């Protein structure tokens, strides 16, 4: 089972997404694909930045985010995950907050993180898969 990183779901929104990513995701049963609530938060943060400059584009992205939330199994950030996150963040840079949250969610639910940025997750000791390379 797989936890999709933000860069993977964002890739699928592109007019011409990477073929290997599309092929991989089409080959996985929907029931095996998960999002962490953090991913939806990252997307919403980008929508709010976009809204300041282009309300129409932000509305389009908002509709896409709603579709994402309805289409995937979304895992909440609960107390156990936040405790794992705190362990992962001990003596780490503040720049990896979101990645550490996604990694903690993956650890708790025993999921493989699917990301283009495997290096960002390498020290979290979670299984990783880069669909852009296949």
Segment roles from a protein language model:
Residues 1, 103, 108-134:
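Acidic, PIN/NYN-like endoribonuclease modules and their adjacent C-terminal/linker elements
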Residues 1-35, 49-63, 134:
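Short, well-structured N-terminal submotif of metal-dependent ribonuclease cores
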Residues 2, 29-34, 68-75, 112:
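Short loop->beta-strand "edge-of-pocket" segments that line small-molecule binding or catalytic clefts
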Residues 5, 36, 95-96, 117:
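Histidine- and aromatic-rich ligand-binding microenvironments
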Residues 9, 40-43, 82, 121:
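A generic structural signal for short hydrophobic patches within well-formed alpha-helices
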Residues 11-12, 24, 46, 84-85, ...:
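Residues that scaffold the ATP/ADP-binding catalytic core of kinase and kinase-like folds
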Residues 37-38, 78, 117, 132:
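Residues at the C-termini of beta-strands that transition into short coil/loop
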Residues 45-48, 71-116:
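Active-site neighborhoods of divalent-metal-dependent phosphate/nucleic-acid chemistry enzymes
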């Amino acid at each position: 089972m797989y936890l999709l990183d933000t860069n993977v779901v964002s890739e699928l929104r592109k007019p011409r997404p990477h073929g290997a990513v599309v092929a991989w995701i089409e080959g996985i049963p929907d029931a095996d694909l998960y999002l962490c609530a953090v991913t939806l938060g990252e997307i919403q943060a980008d929508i709010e930045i976009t809204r300041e400059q282009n309300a129409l584009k932000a509305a389009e992205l908002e509709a896409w985010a709603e579709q994402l939330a309805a289409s995937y199994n979304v895992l909440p950030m609960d107390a156990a995950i936040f405790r794992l996150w705190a362990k992962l963040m001990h003596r780490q840079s503040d720049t990896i907050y979101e990645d550490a949250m996604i990694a903690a969610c993956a650890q708790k639910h025993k999921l493989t993180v699917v990301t283009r940025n495997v290096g960002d997750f390498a020290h979290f000791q979670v299984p990783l898969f880069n669909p852009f390379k296949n």
